[in-house]
Amino acid sequence: MTIYLIRHAQSEFNAVHDLNKPDPMIFDAPITKLGEMQARQARNEVEKLNIKSVIVSPFTRTIQTAQLIFGSKFPFQISAAVREQLCNSCDVGSTPSKLSKNFPLLNFDHLNECWWHEGEKDHRGIAVEPEEVLIERVSIFAEELKSKNIQSTAIVSHGNFIRALTGIKPKNCELIEYVPR
């Protein structure tokens, strides 16, 4: 059973974020021109694989990345389970109605209005998702992968989600082979 994890392409947030500066407050950031190039390069690598289905986080950057890599070859399963840990403004998502307007061929009906982490907000107005909450969410998802025997699937997700699942912090558009244990 092989799963291919792909971190999204460079987003507008990634392009300007500096840990030594304040959060640039770019919510649900789209990908950049460099991100588009990264996704097209990843497509060449992915085309060699025997992928049969694609699970995508509901953030704009992951959907755009998946569309550039896979085109309309597969229907995307949009899953909030593979979303990013909420740490910054870019990790606050868009509502299902806004996503439906931006991506009319995809189905977001199953998502809650607020499908990202909710909790006490910090000085920026961001409800930071604690590491232990991320770990629990990732563990539940990993068990689901095993129990459903999901195979030959690509998951377009995020750095902290992939790190929590594999121990590897991927670069933008990096492909990581994952075998659930």
Give residue spans per PLM region.
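Short beta-strand scaffold positions
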Residues: 56-57, 136, 156-157
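Short, catalytically relevant binding-site loops at active-site mouths
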Residues: 60-61, 83-86, 162
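Active-site-adjacent alpha-helix immediately C-terminal to a catalytic or transition-state-stabilizing loop
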Residues: 139-181
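A short, well-structured juxtamembrane/interface segment
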Residues: 39-45, 134-143
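Short glycine-/acidic-enriched loop or helix-start segments at secondary-structure transitions
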Residues: 15-16, 65-66, 88, 164-167
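Phosphate-handling substructures
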Residues: 15-16, 20-30, 72-136
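Alpha-helical structural signal in soluble globular domains
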Residues: 45, 68-72, 98, 102, ...
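Active-site-proximal alpha-helix that buttresses catalytic centers in soluble enzyme cores
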Residues: 2, 6-78, 173
